[in-house]
Amino acid sequence: MAKKKAFTPLFYLASIVFLPWWISFSVNKCLESWVTNWWNTGQSEIFLNNIQEKSLLEKFIELEELLFLDEMIKEYSETHLEEFGIGIHKETIQLIKIQNENRIHTILHFSTNIICFIILSGYSILGNEKLVILNSWAQEFLYNLSDTVKAFSILLLTDLCIGFHSPHGWELMIGSIYKDFGFVHNDQIISGLVSTFPVILDTIFKYWIFRYLNRLSPSLVVIYHSMND
């Protein structure tokens, strides 16, 4: 019975790690056909924001220029001009289909992530007792580490999150989140978030050192500053 109680939090931890993937996959598959059918039959207009409009227009202009260049190489004739018009028409339809699929992708992924967040929040609330046990284990593990190991771990974590090369990692992570939610890639927004998050984290971390570590373990702060210098 004691072993079973001891392993229960571990099973709960494993479920927290793997459950989001399973929920996301299942919800995505369940909603895919419904969202596709709803969008294709219930929407009479295509809604585009400024970024999507600009992207679609750029693709259309690029396509038109390529087809026009291809026709410039050939001899001019009525047949070629007709083929040029037909080619423009076909490729325009293809661009519209791609844009339609992108909109479905956005709605599907956004809905999936919202549902997953609600389910996992409820799962975490119901498993609050197990989370308390896991938290006590983590605190005990950290307490048993030496100050040198703690300082090294803090230094490694801060360098990864707010170090010199951290913007590249933030850019990849924020871009991945953008893609996961189905949003259109926006360099300006991503650059703004990349330049803001590390500064906020750095401020929070310095406050944490000043407010808590100096009181709990002054020797750890001394070792950390020595290693950081």
From Swiss-Prot:
Source taxon at top rank: Eukaryota
Protein's membrane topology: Multi-pass membrane protein
GO molecular function, one term: antiporter activity
UniProt KW keywords: Antiport, Chloroplast, Hydrogen ion transport, Ion transport, Membrane, Plastid, Plastid inner membrane, Potassium, Potassium transport, Transmembrane, Transmembrane helix, Transport
Phenotype when the gene is knocked out: Enhanced induction of non-photochemical quenching (NPQ) leading to pale-green phenotype in developing leaves under continuous-light conditions.
Annotated localization: Plastid, Chloroplast inner membrane
Catalytic activity: K(+)(in) + H(+)(out) = K(+)(out) + H(+)(in)
One of the record's GO cellular component terms: chloroplast inner membrane
UniProt record similarity statement: Belongs to the CemA family.
Function: Contributes to K(+)/H(+) antiport activity by supporting proton efflux to control proton extrusion and homeostasis in chloroplasts in a light-dependent manner to modulate photosynthesis. Prevents excessive induction of non-photochemical quenching (NPQ) under continuous-light conditions. Indirectly promotes efficient inorganic carbon uptake into chloroplasts.
PANTHER family documented for this protein: CHLOROPLAST ENVELOPE MEMBRANE PROTEIN, CHLOROPLAST ENVELOPE MEMBRANE PROTEIN-RELATED
Name of this protein: Potassium/proton antiporter CemA
Organism: Nicotiana tabacum
